[in-house]
């Protein structure tokens, strides 16, 4: 597993490099647009690019503590936490896929519905996080404390990924208008 995690970190670094190159190319293209259009689009372009960067940073903030945990041979994740996070992961994947589809096709007819569902999901993630904090505070077992912190970080970063998705989707819609 450590090699998979290391590979994932390298892939995120490569994505960051690609994103930086893409950003430079887009900025050059914006300079060629009429000034009034460029000014308005520039704002939404930067909001969208910042959200893209937040995806990368968020994934790295998820991955690095997990990699450290695995590298140091700490306690494996419990089946209970796996079962709890699996539907969360699937929902995140679904939201990101839907957002990608809106952006790739430029069709934003039902985007408001996705934003509303994502906002509700952020609230659910906040509840998961609060419940997990309560579990940490109630636990008598110091052996699982580090694992609990890694999982808490995963929940927090998951919430931030959804927030970034919402910002990016709004920015993409405004950019296309």
Regions found by a protein language model. Name each.
Residues 1-177:
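Cytosolic, long alpha-helical scaffolding segments
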